[in-house]
Amino acid sequence: MTINALLLSSSRVGDTPYLAHAIPFIKPLTTNAQKWIFIPYAGVSMSYDTYLASVVTGLSELELDISGIHQHPDPQQAIKDADGILIGGGNTFHLLHQLYRYDLVTLIGEQVALGKPYIGWSAGSNVSGLSIRTTNDMPIIEPPSFNALNLVPFQLNPHYSNYQAPGHNGETRAQRLLEFTKVDPLTPVVGIVEGSALWRQGDKLSLLGDQPAYLFCGEQQEIPIPVGSDLSHLLKA
């Protein structure tokens, strides 16, 4: 079996309905997967039931059977029984903390390596990389480790934008990712813009959507990755 993982930058683009832009990206992963488990642990400011309902509504046209992991007495068994795994956005630190709390980090990696499709957006994409050291989120809780699912052997930065508001004197996103590459110059970081996604199919990695991505690695800073690029070489990192 081969890894089949879709890593979305965001759940929305502009004012579009929740997950609407992602339907064409998600649909191919559902061909042989009807029963999905949704992991809402990144959702801190809403109830897990509310979060689940928004996902079910957003993906309703795909007619999937989606349940929340919080509805199952045994989270590990719920992962094993599902045909596919969905992880939504929110706070990446809280998400990873809970994945460690229920001992799901290694299990999810193993299940995806066996061919179980994985779909994540925002925080759900952050945790798919080597670690969460390039998340945008506030560290509201401390997970046992920053090491993540390792579905791709590099770092991700969803919602990537280097916009700086006039008069604002804080660091830009590019400056913050530069700091990471100074500390860890050998590990690539891919910034994915809202509306785009990375899709790993075994040894193939593709950039989906109509926006470029951006690569940071060592002395290479904010290198544009053209729309439709084959990024398979990053899987050999």
Swiss-Prot record:
Q: Does the keyword Protease apply?
A: yes
SUPFAM superfamilies, alphabetically? Class I glutamine amidotransferase-like (SSF52317)
One example of a Gene Ontology biological process annotation: proteolysis
Tell me what reaction this enzyme catalyses: Dipeptidase E catalyzes the hydrolysis of dipeptides Asp-|-Xaa. It does not act on peptides with N-terminal Glu, Asn or Gln, nor does it cleave isoaspartyl peptides
Keyword entries, A-Z: Cytoplasm, Dipeptidase, Hydrolase, Protease, Serine protease
Active-site residues, as the UniProt record annotates them: 122 (charge relay system), 137 (charge relay system), 159 (charge relay system)
Q: Give the highest taxon in the source lineage.
A: Bacteria
EC number(s) stated in the UniProt entry for this protein: 3.4.13.21
Q: Which NCBIfam families does the protein's record reference? A: PRK05282.1 (NF003642)
In Swiss-Prot or TrEMBL terms, this protein is called Peptidase E
Q: Which organism is it from?
A: Shewanella baltica (strain OS155 / ATCC BAA-1091)
Q: Which gene encodes it?
A: pepE
